[in-house]
């Protein structure tokens, strides 16, 4: 973040936080922090069922996607104990020429360059700070920031306390979520209800942990634990071991009427930084072969989920799917001169569904990233996912190129 003195952007922020009594422009913007980002993504996805049927894809039937996202953040000190935050976001997905089909196989045409979408308010909240009790109270529209969500936004309140060194206590309530605008809530997600919860986060280097508990009204009780430990062998050989467990107990009506099952997720990962190399390996297990179960509320949440496609494949979607999954993974990367990183990752395993043949899945990912400057990064990856079920063989090739600027 940087302090803005006088600019068009800061004037816009001043307008967002105008008081009942007029003040000078210089006075209004003197304590406004401005930050933000701009991201452009080009991506293309091609799925081949192995019998000549190609869904989506590139080349002659391309459905290339151009995704633009920009955020402008303004944080203003209103008084000694109050701050206001607003985030404006611009986000579009523009498809190239070709046939695009949705998850139901229906043809969707969305071709052309978008020149009409505008910035919208993504977050807007008021924050009260009591330094004597090391407590912050936040209420409004904000990112949920839970272990079950990635970047979901909800309307509600949080209370955060840091009165004990190394410990953070949090309580939260969300009355609604940006389910329609986000696009990463699953159709079977339990994110359709108010969420009440608490968390304890501890960081006592080299040991850290998180304990989460929540109640999704009339849906489920959710709980999660994350623990990690760091250790080293000499200079330049740093290791970290991490374990996670997430579970939920669904309302009996949802089990009986919708045939859902209680969710259970476990994962373990060992990672290492040895000189210019970074390595990781581990296992992940979750799901139920007899009914739909849910692990996360939105996208892949903050769980251990390596790879780029496998956790979105049929039977393996973390926001709700039918299938018992067990995967193992490994990856290695090398960074040149602290700027250019090349990486390779592998994820493999099986999805089981009662009454069906097991699906063997393997994903191979090659990635590259280049830190042009502390603020500007270029990156990309190629992912190849195979799914084998008896005589059926499918493969999915996914490419993404990205430019990201932060300030």
What feature does the model see in each segment?
Residues 161, 166-229:
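Internal metal/ion-chelating core segments
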Residues 2-140, 160-162, 227-235, 243, ...:
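Beta-barrel outer-membrane channel/assembly domains of diderm bacteria
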Residues 134-146, 157, 169-176, 198, ...:
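Transmembrane beta-strand segments that form the barrel wall of outer-membrane beta-barrel proteins
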Residues 58-62, 142-150, 216, 246-261:
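Outer-membrane beta-barrel proteins
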Residues 118, 144-156, 175-180, 190-192, ...:
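Solvent-exposed loop/turn segments connecting transmembrane beta-strands
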Residues 203-206, 228-352:
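Detector for outer-membrane/organellar transmembrane beta-barrel domains
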Residues 20-37, 41-54, 58-62, 198-215, ...:
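Glycine/serine-rich loop-strand microenvironments at binding/catalytic pocket rims
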Residues 48-58, 100-110, 176, 183-189, ...:
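Solvent-exposed loop segments that connect transmembrane elements
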């Amino acid at each position: 973040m940087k302090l803005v003195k006088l600019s068009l952007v800061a004037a816009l922020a001043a307008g967002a936080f105008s008081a009942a009594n007029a003040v000078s422009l210089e006075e209004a913007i003197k304590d406004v922090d401005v930050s933000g980002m701009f991201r452009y993504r080009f991506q293309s996805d091609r799925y081949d069922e192995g019998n000549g049927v190609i869904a989506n894809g590139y080349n002659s039937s391309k459905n290339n996607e151009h995704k633009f996202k920009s955020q402008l953040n303004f944080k203003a000190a209103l008084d000694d104990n109050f701050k206001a935050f607003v985030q404006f976001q611009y986000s579009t997905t523009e498809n190239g020429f070709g046939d695009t089909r949705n998850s139901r196989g229906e043809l969707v045409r969305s071709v052309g360059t978008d020149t009409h979408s505008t910035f919208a308010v993504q977050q807007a909240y008021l924050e009260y700070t009591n330094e004597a009790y090391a407590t912050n109270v936040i209420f409004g529209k904000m990112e949920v920031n839970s272990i079950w969500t990635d970047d979901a936004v909800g309307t509600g309140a949080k209370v955060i306390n840091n009165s004990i060194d190394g410990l953070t206590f949090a309580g939260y309530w969300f009355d609604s979520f940006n389910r329609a605008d986000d696009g990463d809530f699953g159709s079977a997600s339990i994110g359709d209800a108010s969420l009440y919860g608490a968390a304890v986060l501890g960081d006592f280097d080299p040991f850290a942990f998180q304990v989460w508990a929540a109640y999704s009204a009339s849906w489920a009780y959710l709980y999660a634990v994350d623990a990690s430990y760091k250790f080293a062998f000499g200079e330049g050989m740093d290791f970290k071991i991490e374990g996670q467990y997430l579970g939920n107990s669904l309302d009996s009506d949802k089990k009986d009427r919708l045939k859902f099952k209680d969710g259970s997720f476990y994962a373990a990962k060992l990672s290492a930084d040895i000189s210019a190399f970074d390595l990781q390996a581990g296992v992940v297990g979750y799901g139920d072969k007899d009914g739909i179960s849910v692990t996360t509320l939105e996208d892949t949440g903050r769980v251990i989920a390596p790879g780029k496609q496998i956790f979105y494949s049929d039977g393996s979607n973390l926001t709700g799917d039918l299938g018992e999954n067990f995967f193992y993974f490994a990856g290695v990367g090398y960074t040149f001169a602290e700027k250019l990183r090349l990486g390779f990752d592998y994820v493999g395993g099986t999805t089981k569904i009662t009454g069906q043949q097991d699906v063997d899945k393997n994903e191979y990912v090659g990635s590259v990233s280049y830190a042009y400057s502390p603020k500007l990064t270029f990156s990309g990856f190629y992912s190849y996912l195979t799914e084998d079920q008896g005589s059926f063989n499918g493969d999915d090739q996914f490419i993404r190129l990205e430019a990201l600027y932060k300030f």
